[in-house]
Amino acid sequence: MEMDDESQLVLKAQEGNVEAFMILAKKYEQPVFRLLYRLTKNREDAADLTQETMLKAFRAIKEFKLKSSFNTWLHRIAVNLALNFIKKHQNQKSQMEYLDNLKNEEQEVPVFSSPEEVSISEEFRINLEKAIEELPLAYRTTFSLIVFQGMSHQEAARILGCSENTVSWRMHEARKMLKERLKPFLNLKQEV
């Protein structure tokens, strides 16, 4: 869908055309779900928040100004809902589900020469996922938008309502925290 087509759909949706909005919602449903899943760490919560995001966007579409992309606006709604949800449920520990929707779902399966390498690779994946989940919320949100949603620092800054410098700093700190958290594993991997 080209940007002009998307703008036309937004304008039609603003005029009350439900079908136009449904086309937009269908296009962005999965990226929004993946982001919300990374933030909430729970499929059911992510699915509920995705629905809530689409409903809120539908109700507010007339207020949307075409100053930013529909994608940026929709992700901003999703992030705000997720942050409110997380704050509300901060004291409740939901069971952790391991992430299986990585950025590149069609990644090639690596070829390992030994069972030890398979075990180490699986251990690394689990440790990486856990390390990402343990990042402070602001860093995890920024990291998820850029790494898993493929957004630029500028787009992430618009969604998060902060400066590009803040986004860059959060990415720097998130990478530093991940590297520190994974340091024992990285040393082990180099020894094999």
Show which residues each predicted segment covers.
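Sigma70-family region 2
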Residues: 14-15, 41, 54-69, 88-90
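DNA-recognition helix of helix-turn-helix
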Residues: 72, 83, 139, 145-148, ...
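Arg/Lys-rich amphipathic alpha helix in sigma70-family domain 2
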Residues: 62-65, 76-97, 173, 184
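Internal acidic/polar
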Residues: 3, 92-118
